[in-house]
Amino acid sequence: MIFLNINNLNVSIEGKKILDDFNLTINQGEVHAIMGPNGSGKSTLANVLAGNEDYEVNSGKIIFKDSDLLDLNIEERAQAGIFLAFQYPVEIPGVNITPFLQSAINAKLKNNKKPELDNLSFAKILRKKAEALGINTDMLKRSINTGFSGGEKKRYEILQMSILNPEFTIFDETDSGLDVDALRIVTEGINKFKNEKNSFLIITHYQKLLDYIRPDHVHVMRNGKIVKSGDISLAGEIELSGYQNF
């Protein structure tokens, strides 16, 4: 089943073209990885999929589950099942993690015409998922990402993903700034969440992340478009010789 279909997408920012007739198809349950040098358009793609209005879509289509994604705003995309894990998660002082996540999941449940979770029911779910990810429950009393280490910020994003249960998750260089132990914890969380009903797009510079999360397809991106696609062996080729051959 085709889950996401991007067809001839052209995107610019401040008059500069970033994505150039970009095409990509992701089926339900698949994990795709996009690799490429700085400036190739990887993060632009992630932001456009999530609905960042700083980018201008000049032409093309993005079909997600039979709906035109370009007709939906950021909130509508989130409610439709899209989740973006940022390269640099922002700090939100004064906004506590627990009520924020409860409000987010209840908004999604309400949108899907399902009963909302009361405080006790949500607290039990949150604690269980936090413990499964190795997150100290004291962290749940803090403001979002405020004073967090790089690893804590990434773990919180995985917790958020686990709570919201999105159908399509985009990881924009989620391995950036992580040491080996933090990378292992984060990728274990992703692998626990992965199943045949949800799909992933992993954007990264390095093969190391793909040693932990084995993608079904690997793509090389340069100058705003995919220039080569293959399996995990393509990531190994990049590790050995870089991007000069593409």
Ranges and model annotations:
Residues 35-37:
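The feature captures the beta-strand-to-loop junction immediately N-terminal to the Walker
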Residues 84-88, 94-110, 122-125:
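Q-loop/switch helix immediately C-terminal to the Walker
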Residues 170-174, 181:
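Walker B catalytic motif
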Residues 217, 221, 225-246:
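Conserved beta-strand-loop-alpha-helix hinge in the C-terminal portion
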